[in-house]
């Protein structure tokens, strides 16, 4: 209904305003650290990496899950969730110049059970597609952190504290691997003549 669409529009604008307030209305290119936002161009399906422009608007576009939030119009195009074409944007991080890419895999895994009904089949198919895309990107990361959040659905906001706790546990468990990788990078840098 029209009321539902307006509610989603308001939620999206609230996110945009919140992000812009957090960055003091600085555009992406003026942020202190290199930053990029990945979104999907709805008309073409192309991955778009925003490295300039309105920070809040780009984050809103990247967060616009189809069917949950309306697409965000930027310039001539409409944008939706970047996870559709790039679930784990390792390549975007590399393009920014990252020497070490630490990825976090929170993708849903296929359960091994046959889905029920047409909607179940569609959902399972989308999950498989996202999982395969994500695996390709995760393979290009230096370290992958995998919090145990598979039992928590993407819309189960009441379990956010549990999800955060699982993320913290997984990050702490990955620290030795991260430190080892940093050590390897430092050795390579020292060995390269200037």
Regions found by a protein language model. Name each.
Residues 1-194:
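Patatin-like phospholipase
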């Amino acid at each position: 209904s029209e009321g539902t669409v307006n509610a989603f529009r308001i939620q999206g604008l609230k996110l945009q305003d919140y992000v812009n307030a957090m960055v003091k209305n600085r555009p992406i290119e003026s942020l202190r650290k290199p930053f990029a936002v990945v979104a999907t161009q709805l008309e073409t399906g192309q991955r778009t990496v925003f490295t300039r422009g309105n920070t809040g608007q780009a984050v809103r576009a990247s967060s616009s899950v189809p069917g949950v939030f309306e697409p965000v119009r930027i310039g001539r195009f409409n944008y939706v969730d970047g996870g559709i074409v790039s679930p784990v944007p390792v390549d975007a991080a590399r393009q920014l110049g990252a020497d070490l890419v630490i990825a976090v895999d929170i993708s849903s895994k296929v359960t091994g059970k046959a889905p029920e009904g047409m909607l179940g089949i569609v959902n399972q198919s989308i999950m498989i597609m996202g999982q395969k895309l994500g695996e390709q990107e995760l393979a290009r990361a230096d370290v992958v952190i995998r919090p145990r959040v598979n039992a928590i659905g993407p819309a189960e906001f009441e379990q956010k504290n549990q999800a955060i706790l699982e993320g913290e546990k997984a990050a702490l468990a990955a620290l030795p691997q991260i430190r080892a990788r940093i050590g390897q990078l430092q050795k390579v840098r020292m060995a390269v003549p200037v």
